[in-house]
Amino acid sequence: MSRLRPPVSDADHRAGPDDAPVTLLEYGDYECPHCGRAYPIVREVQRRMGRRLRLVFRNFPLAEMHPHAEHAAEAAEAAGVQGKFWEMHDAIFEHQAALTDADLIRYARSLGLDESRVKDELATGVHAARVREDFRSGVRSGVNGTPTFFINGTRYDGSWDLGTLLEALEGAPEDAGKRGQVRNLGTVVHE
């Protein structure tokens, strides 16, 4: 089984408590139809597990197949800088068929983000390095398609239908990778 490299850190986008016993990390592509189908399942897993789950998302845009995936990831990162990563993440997946730059700017506007800042950051590629860093970490972790999930730092290769995924999460040993993790107390965690 593949291990997550690097482990979850304060640099990651996390939803749920950092001390949750289970961490589900997804390497995803905003334009991938499989990720689009996994999105509501992951949301339901979050709802059912509540504070027992920490969700982490890392970008893994498959640009050669999905021409809008990289800019969608950069838009989510731009929203993250303004404190609304998860809101943009949700908006993108909920409107997966509409991912042009104009669409992404429209989502930014609807979320109350600084629209001109997002537009400038997309045009200049300010967040491209972060997206590439996530992608490289996925390659190091053995990711070769999306979505790819890790449960408590170990690659999960089972089915990601709701029942099977919940069963795997409920049966996961506590996340040993969190012990000794350095925390940045200024980090805001979306719950």
What feature does the model see in each segment?
Residues 14-15, 99, 122, 156:
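Short clusters of hydrophobic/aromatic residues that line enzyme substrate/ligand-binding pockets
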Residues 3-5, 26-28, 34-44, 105-191:
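C-terminal cap of thioredoxin/glutaredoxin-like
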Residues 25-109, 114, 179-190:
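Structural alpha/beta surface segment adjacent to cysteine/selenocysteine redox centers
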Residues 5-22:
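A short beta-strand-turn-helix
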